Amino acid sequence: FLSLIPKIAGGIASLVKNL
């Protein structure tokens, strides 16, 4: 589960960066 956190956080960061 802990390994998914950076992946999700990275995905959110990418979405915010694209906005």
From Swiss-Prot:
**Keyword terms, alphabetized:** Amidation, Amphibian defense peptide, Antibiotic, Antimicrobial, Cytolysis, Fungicide, Hemolysis, Immunity, Innate immunity, Secreted
Coiled-coil features, chain-numbered ranges: none
Q: Name one GO biological process term.
A: killing of cells of another organism
Query: Where is it localised?
Result: Secreted
Leucine amide is found on L19
- Primary subcellular site in the record, as a coarse category: secreted
Tissue specificity, per the record, is:
Expressed by the skin glands.
Gene Ontology, cellular component aspect:
extracellular region
Q: What does this protein do?
A: Antimicrobial peptide with activity against Gram-negative bacterium E.coli ATCC 25922 (MIC=25 uM), Gram-positive bacterium S.epidermidis ATCC 12228 (MIC=6.25 uM) and against fungus C.albicans ATCC 24433 (MIC=50 uM). Has an anti-inflammatory effect, since it inhibits the production of the pro-inflammatory cytokine TNF-alpha. Has an activity of stimulation of insulin release, which may protect the species from being eaten by predators by causing fatal hypoglycemia. Is cytotoxic to cancer line cells. Shows moderate hemolysis on mouse erythrocytes (LC(50)=28 uM).
Q: Which family does it belong to?
A: Belongs to the frog skin active peptide (FSAP) family. Phylloseptin subfamily.
The entry's protein name is: Phylloseptin-1.1TR
